[in-house]
Design a protein with these regions (language model features):
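A common structural junction motif
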Residues: 71-78
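Short, solvent-exposed amphipathic alpha-helical segments in soluble enzyme
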Residues: 22, 70-71
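Short, electropositive alpha-helical surface patch
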Residues: 55-68
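A structural signal for short, well-ordered beta-strand segments
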Residues: 5-7, 54, 79
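Short S/T/G/P-rich N-terminal loop/turn motif that feeds into the first structured element of a domain
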Residues: 1-50, 59-62, 84-85
């Protein structure tokens, strides 16, 4: 299944200028995705809006939820199943 995931945070919680937090966010998500059989198909970022977007392939919604678990403290997540047209 494909999923469109939108992450949002605000200026105060932005990781752009906090290297340790950025590494925790990136490493935590990458490792948890691999551990839960979630493939990161594409990554996009709207820096001005503090909004990263991912296209993920996963067996189910639960796998995506588990992959995001280590980074939940960094903001909000909207997970939407999608399909190719």
């Amino acid at each position: 299944m494909l999923f469109h995931v939108t992450h949002t945070h605000d200026y105060q919680t932005c990781m752009a200028h906090r290297e340790e937090a950025r590494n925790e966010f990136n490493d935590g998500f990458t490792k948890a995705a691999a551990a839960n059989n979630v493939q990161i198909m594409a990554t996009y970022n709207n820096r001005g809006r503090h909004t990263p977007i991912w296209i993920l392939e996963a067996p189910d919604y639960h796998a995506v939820d588990k992959a995001l678990e280590p980074i939940l403290k960094f903001g909000n997540y909207d997970i939407v199943p999608v399909s190719a047209m």
